[in-house]
Amino acid sequence: MRPLTPLAALAALAALATVTACGGSPAADTATGGDGGPKGAKGTVTVRIPDPGNSGVLALGKKDGSLDEALAAVGAKVAWTGSAGPFAPAAQAMNADQLDIATGSITSGITSLSQSPGFAFFTATDPDPVGEGILVREGSDIASVKDLVGRKVAVNKGGTGEYLLLKALAGAGIPADEVERVYLRPDQTAAVFNAGQVDAWAVWSTYAVAEIGSGKARFLADGTAIGSDNYSLNAVRSKFAEEHPEIVKALYAYLHENSAKERKDPAAYLNVFTDAGPTAVNGKAKEVQIAFTAKAGTVDPIGPEDVKRFETVARFYADQKVTPNKVDIAAHLLDVEKLS
């Protein structure tokens, strides 16, 4: 991805997302006698990030201390706050000054931006070509997107699942109202899907890996077949980005470098803390996850071509009545390489 040319929206840096001290507002570690900022080594700024769990770049960075080292270089430290999951609740937490950094899709980002956001996006990862899509059970008579007519499909409202389904239907020339959308939280959908209470499930790799790895499900259509523009983005609380741009830039640099390493050696980023229990990925599911990650994108700056595709998604959501109007996504983007 090429860096953004100056965007008019970026002139208002105060509208950008944040990383701040643990508590109600940005603050330094009072034990160090700091002034709230990372400069001058007087205080340490605390960055609140959802706990990454057992896999991924942040999980390994948490374990080996490399993330602490990268943040310490700019006078910051991480506080693991809550757990990683769907973007909508994370966006609400950033708006309420309870979280500073979160990861989500452009689709869930757009719906969250339609609700008085206090955050902005500062990185982009290309749409997942193979790890997201529409799942059907093995043995299902659903052989094409057109076979979804009259069926029930589980989706997360306003997020990746609803986008993938609507995009697939539009591509097949099927009116959206000819397929019943069943709105469910993704972490509550597997049991419903496997019990046959829905016919298909539009979802991303976090949940698809276990289903495909079990041998009980397959993708009817993946991201490539659907023509997905569903980028993964990192968001930062706006006031934090305004006050501590150098920390946002350092976090980006860490994510960029290590996401490239993860793509080259996916297995090294799995089962970081344990290879047993519900957070571990083993057997066929591990093979599936490694294959997905090897084809995934890296964490990059947001470039002009990316913005065009974001705008396409925003227009599509407005046309499909997912959002009441087209969200001005460009007003909530940060050129991370120009922060200083």
Model region roles, listed by residue range:
Residues 1-10:
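Bacterial N-terminal signal peptides that target proteins for export
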Residues 17-21:
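C-terminal motif of bacterial Sec signal peptides marking the signal peptidase cleavage site
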Residues 23-26:
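Bacterial signal peptide processing site
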Residues 29-175, 181-183, 199, 228:
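Short, glycine-/small- and polar/acidic-enriched structural segments
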Residues 107, 181, 187-276:
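Pocket-lining segment of extracytoplasmic ligand-binding domains
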Residues 125-136, 217-240, 248, 252, ...:
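Periplasmic-binding protein-like
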Residues 242-322:
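Secondary-structure end/capping motifs
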Residues 314-340:
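Conserved C-terminal helix/tail region of periplasmic/extracytoplasmic solute-binding proteins
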